[in-house]
């Protein structure tokens, strides 16, 4: 992976080693983003025409290009590690050894089975070792991996593994609660169900007290 930050390369290698990387083909380095958008727009035009839509209508004529731009620059931007957020780690001079929790992180992802929306929130906690991470970086990491075709179980484990790798500690926990529009808007059309996934590492898995403290934070209990 050329021209990646040290953190992005480290994270990618950790996910590959654990079998948690999103299924990806070898990168097509010869294609820049503008070429990708042009090709996607062309294929989207064909799909819309096969649906018998009239692309000469002023409401539809730019839709293939809008979709292509949205895919490459927005909802699937996390497929490109060049977009991995800049990470700020601070030496733990304060010797913080209690749980740090970031709750209700908004995430919007895309179901890789049907390419429809996953809409949810994540709660992430860790117990610092040698470093602490800028709090907004946790949100950005969640959003980066959400900006891919995903399954929720993998997304949860990816966030856990990435933070363990960057922070140099296994003491990380992640919980995601999300509504899947492949369930809500099609198939069974269940508009009220939600899916919760949790991934625990280190003390969050081995210590009942630490685990319960995290789960209380997830449930917003004092």
From Swiss-Prot:
Zn(2+) binds at residues 111, 114, 182. GO terms for biological process: one-carbon metabolic process; tetrahydrobiopterin biosynthetic process; tetrahydrofolate biosynthetic process. Pathway: Cofactor biosynthesis; 7,8-dihydroneopterin triphosphate biosynthesis; 7,8-dihydroneopterin triphosphate from GTP: step 1/1. PROSITE patterns: GTP_CYCLOHYDROL_1_1, GTP_CYCLOHYDROL_1_2. It catalyses: GTP + H2O = 7,8-dihydroneopterin 3'-triphosphate + formate + H(+). It comes from the Bacteria. It is an enzyme of class 3 (hydrolase). Keywords: GTP-binding, Hydrolase, Metal-binding, Nucleotide-binding, One-carbon metabolism, Zinc. Toroid-shaped homodecamer, composed of two pentamers of five dimers. This is GTP cyclohydrolase 1.
């Amino acid at each position: 992976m050329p021209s990646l930050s040290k953190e992005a390369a480290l994270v990618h290698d950790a996910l590959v080693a654990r079998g948690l990387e999103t299924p990806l083909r070898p990168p097509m380095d010869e294609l820049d983003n503008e070429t990708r958008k042009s090709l996607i727009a062309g294929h989207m035009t064909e799909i819309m025409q096969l649906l018998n839509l009239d692309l000469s209508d002023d409401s539809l004529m730019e839709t293939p290009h809008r979709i292509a731009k949205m895919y490459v620059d927005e909802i699937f931007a996390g497929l490109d590690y060049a977009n991995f957020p800049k990470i700020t780690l601070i030496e733990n001079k304060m010797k913080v050894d209690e749980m740090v929790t970031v709750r209700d992180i908004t995430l919007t992802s895309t179901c890789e089975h049907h390419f429809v929306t996953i809409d949810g929130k994540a709660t992430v906690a860790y117990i610092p070792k040698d470093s602490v991470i800028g709090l907004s970086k946790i949100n950005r990491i969640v959003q980066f991996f959400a900006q891919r075709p995903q399954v929720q179980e993998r997304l949860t484990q990816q966030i856990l593994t990435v933070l363990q790798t960057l922070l140099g500690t296994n003491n990380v926990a992640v919980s995601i609660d999300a509504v899947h529009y492949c369930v809500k808007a099609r198939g069974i059309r269940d508009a009220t169900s939600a899916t919760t996934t949790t991934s625990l590492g280190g003390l969050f898995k081995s210590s009942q007290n630490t685990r319960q403290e995290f789960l209380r934070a997830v449930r917003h209990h004092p």
